[in-house]
């Protein structure tokens, strides 16, 4: 993964009265310190590199000297303020050249010799070197980081000439090292001498190291302004496979009020990571959120607008501090993730044993080897503490991506007649990852207890596809016409199959079935239908049971949150 997302190096170049200068690069070329050691070891041009691809990636730009990099990366003034991207062989340079607009007129009013005191730097460029085949989303993210650093440096330069001071220090150290190299036997890299003495150089090194490890960059330029950045490719990944940022954004846009926010760390540690000037609303969301509380309830408890809770939840998810789940209730069905480690002595097993001393992780995961609802773990004779511990264990496993939640989807499946053997494209059922479950099994018709999500009947006036309008009661002509209009979108054999069901003789059942018909394409799970239509779970399950001859029930992950349920490695 690091081959495609980690930068090769970070480079700072400037252009001014002294020409184009490479102020700093990291990792710097340590091989320059002892060039003789490289020539004393004959090596075949066909020999295999013993250090592997990682060393090649580290030195991907090593063939470019400092002078060459300063020439090609210090752009013209006309290119400042926009994205800079240059590809040379297998290296791609990405930056955001920035022009330093100094008020020379103001300097001349207060200084009798403005020519001597005028700033010598005209522009600078913070450049990240990447592999040429890097994903475009990675390129855009690193350009965004370069732009943020450049904006802060430009601000500090205007405020206190911070960049000019650091550049003068770097150039003085480079001259000093160059003089030492002339007196000694060979050249030395000046950057290892610059690093301990220059705060800006240490910040750039920290940014590079963070990008190569966690993907989260937090800098305090000039110990004053903060630069925060998240490389989503490093934070969101599943089973050694990258999750594209576009998939994360699509899932975040599909968040609904019936979803819940699950923090991936405890409240205390998460609050300690927040910046001092963070939003008070974010703190309230973190303190109020719960795995058994949906976002609408969270907004009410935190006294915030639902839209603001959506934005804060998306912010936490993007930064890898939380994931979106469905609120925990006894009707939830979970199965062990195919990527979960079942080793007896794995690090996760040791953590689980410390957290829950009376249980071991492999035994608990074995209970979820097949899809199982949480209601099956409940016992009327068990103490309340046992149910609390069960919730804590499920939350712990969800945080580590060890469990996958399965939802119930319904597909209309009416057998075609001989006269019409071909189905329309819209009638093809959604392919389920888990096989269909018969409605006659207890698991499919679990009505739940009064404390279950059967009582979750929230209204959602903002839903576009909501059709829970008030209908006239009784078997009136208006009801018949509305039912016929709803069934008109079906093919002839589908209408005939539905009307042949005994439950279709009941006008109320037929009208409810027709009203929910657009949900029976395998794209809306049971909980979404409950929320959109303000309907109880028991009502829907009874309807599915009555029309089971033309319906197929399947269980699989919710595509909206499936991207968050994969195992982190």
From Swiss-Prot:
Compositionally biased intervals (Polar residues): 34-52, 441-468
Keywords, sorted A to Z: GTPase activation, Lysosome, Membrane, Phosphoprotein
GO term, biological process aspect, one: aorta morphogenesis
Chief place where the protein resides: membrane
Location in or out of the cell: Lysosome membrane
Residues found modified as Phosphoserine: 476
Region (Disordered): 27-60, 441-476
GO molecular function: GTPase activator activity
Pfam families, per database record: HTH_NPRL3 (PF24064), NPR3 (PF03666)
Xref: InterPro entries: Galactose-bd-like_sf, HTH_NPRL3, Npr3
GO cellular component: a single term: lysosomal membrane
Outcome of gene disruption: Lethality towards the end of gestation caused by a range of cardiac defects, including outflow tract abnormalities and ventricular-septal defects.
Purpose of the protein: As a component of the GATOR1 complex functions as an inhibitor of the amino acid-sensing branch of the mTORC1 pathway. In response to amino acid depletion, the GATOR1 complex has GTPase activating protein (GAP) activity and strongly increases GTP hydrolysis by RagA/RRAGA (or RagB/RRAGB) within heterodimeric Rag complexes, thereby turning them into their inactive GDP-bound form, releasing mTORC1 from lysosomal surface and inhibiting mTORC1 signaling.
Family per similarity comment: Belongs to the NPR3 family.
Subunit structure: Within the GATOR complex, component of the GATOR1 subcomplex, made of DEPDC5, NPRL2 and NPRL3. GATOR1 mediates the strong interaction of the GATOR complex with small GTPases Rag (RagA/RRAGA, RagB/RRAGB, RagC/RRAGC and/or RagD/RRAGD) heterodimers. GATOR1 interacts with GPR155/LYCHOS; interaction takes place in presence of cholesterol and prevents interaction between GATOR1 and KICSTOR.
Protein name per UniProt: GATOR1 complex protein NPRL3
Organism expressing this protein natively: Mus musculus (Mouse)
